[in-house]
Amino acid sequence: MKTKINLNNKNILITGAAGFIGAALTQRILREYTGVTIIGVDNMNDYYDPMLKEYRNQANKSARLDGHLNGYKFIRGNIADKALVDNLFQECSFDIVVNLAAQAGVRYSIDHPDVYIESNIIGFYNILEACRHTYDNQRQGVQHLVYASSSSVYGGNKKVPFSTEDPVDHPVSLYAATKKSNELLAHSYAKLYNIPCTGLRFFTVYGPAGRPDMFYFSATNKLRKGQTIDIYNYGNCKRDFTYIDDIVEGIIRVMQGAPEKKKGEDGLPIPPYALYNIGGGQPENLLDFVQTLQEELVRAGVLPEDYEFDEHKRLVPMQPGDVPVTYADSTGLERDYGFTPKIGIREGLRKFAEWYANYYSYRA
């Protein structure tokens, strides 16, 4: 059973609000729900082009439901700053917290482990602690903490599709280890302090205004410059690509259904905790994905019609920390929230290519 939450007239904290997923979520909520106040937090770091984050954040500020004021306030800051987080929670009574702030990137974590520990573990701990203290003095407290995990926690899992019931005790990257740590910490806080927590394992998110370090975006940048793109594991990689609108739809449905608070037969609280995959459920071979991407880039006018694709592809070995396949079993999400991702690769890449053409024309 889930405790139903109506998003109208709610105070919501979204961390990572200028990030790919955070901005798309913020804009969707502001356009569809009345009386909502969103506090968006982001450190706006330079892991990738800060101008893209500014672009997303401007879209956050302008997003609104017709006839209603925009209820968005932006705070530039790092959730690893405990004083900042504590002050936010003291100033605002949050009904729902969505923690999307994190240092992303599997390969980047190999050479920069410190920033992952700071943001993904210390930062998340600060959020958990702040949520815990919203219950002080018998107050109602945060009704639901939703946080981002990742498909990377599955590591080299041989069983497909990946289920949340599968053991994930052997991460192959530091990024994955921090995300698994988030799940463990959230479960502990749900058990000890009865905080309703739901973790979401996202599978290879793509779409307009995405992260330039993601394969589809970086490949587009390189192709546009006439450079060669590397396709890992000699093309024998499959990814469960999931379009951003499907990810956001999944998050919004989950936000509105918190794990129920109840007691077990021993009279002790059962942790109000849940974990779901959000993935398309249709792994795509990278070579096929690239072919579709190139076709849509030509269609959008990003690449010329006579572009020599084969001259700009190079098959290379698997990279450290990478895995050959990701494949989501999202039946739990369908069972509990009635939702399954629906947007196919060609439709999603077409929307990305059209956005890319418009964005870089605007930037020129």
PLM segments and residue spans:
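A glycine/serine/threonine-rich, flexible loop-to-helix segment
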Residues: 160-161, 212-220
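N-terminal Rossmann-like NAD(P)+-binding domain of SDR-like oxidoreductases, especially those catalyzing
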Residues: 1-205, 292, 359-362
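Generic recognition of short, well-ordered alpha-helical segments
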Residues: 24, 87, 108-111, 122, ...
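C-terminal substrate-binding subdomain of Rossmann-fold SDR/epimerase-dehydratase oxidoreductases
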Residues: 1-5, 9, 28, 70, ...
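Amphipathic alpha-helical recognition patches that constitute DNA-binding helices
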Residues: 16, 20, 169, 173, ...
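Short beta-strand/turn micro-motifs at beta-sheet edges
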Residues: 158, 192, 219, 262-266
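Residue-level recognition of oxygen-bearing side chains
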Residues: 84, 93, 115, 122, ...
